[in-house]
Amino acid sequence: DFIKAGKPALAIDPLRIAAGVDVAAEALAWAEGHIGQGPVLVYSTAEPSAVRAIQGKLGSEKAGAMVEDTIAAIARGLVQRGVRQLIVAGGETSGACVQALGITQMRIGAQIDPGVPWCHAVAPDARDGLHITLKSGNFGSTDFFTKAFAQLQA
């Protein structure tokens, strides 16, 4: 597991987004300190009870949309800063990121796990290309993230 291995990881708090904090800018500032040293993880998942509490305060759709928009802004900011390898988890989040990145084409590449390949994408801020994988639902093994980046480095 990426986090258990001590890799750089940052949790996104939907309540801070709802309070008007520019969480995307904070995440990008944090990521800048790690870019070039290896993969980083920006995530928004939590224990089911915490998710229910947040959804109870904000509403399920609003909470989801805020997180998706924030992750999409972070993805775009990372690509603008030269990052050329992204893994996006979550179906709605994947769609938001593809849209925010302005991806116009994707070529299917090597399979990481059944149903989840690396893709080579064409996007305005990544004219030299972008390796991206869009992982939704329960696809992928428990070591998916580590395995995905190892595959690109092989």
At which residue positions do the language-model features occur?
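Active-site catalytic microenvironments in core metabolic enzymes, especially phosphate/sugar-handling
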Residues: D1-A154
